[in-house]
Amino acid sequence: VYRAEALCGLCASDEMDEDDRAEWVPIIVESMLEEERAWRLAESIGIISKSAGNWPGARARKAMMSNLIAVTGGLPAGEARVDALKSISGKVSEQRLPELFLLAVENHGMEAKASRPVIKAIVGTKNLDMIAEITSSLTEATPDLAVKLLDNLHRLAVESNLGLHPTALELSLPLLDGADFETVRTLCSHAS
């Protein structure tokens, strides 16, 4: 991964043309995939996404981000995927955020933690259609998980002064019976 990170840094140079930068993307990805430790690969995804965000020219940057999303999806469910999603959520294009959201909810056992940074990035776009799209997905989860995710969405929407109708809090009310007591308590403390 160190090679991948170094190559990615070189791609930020204005002296490199876009075609060369685009040719290096698969080399960078191959170098990343040589890493066997999931936590280190997740860390590298963050470093490379930050560096690629500084590349001049959009074509190679878009290809790199697309590959980073694929590498993130290839990580095993767990803390490494949470870390990768946290580091990449604020750096991908708005159109790719629903894809990251799916990777987060597929991170079994850590869905809520993995979804937080992605939901934050989605709310940050203020794209009401996208927010409505993920909101319907949130309500389809198990009651406990749905309440956790809707609580997070509600908090972020309030912080961003987004007027969602119905609110995420209102959508969570019918799910409270099936949610864990601690989850309900947390929701109530955030609602006040």
Model regions and ranges:
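Non-catalytic tandem-repeat scaffold regions and their flanking low-complexity/translocation tails
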Residues: 1-192
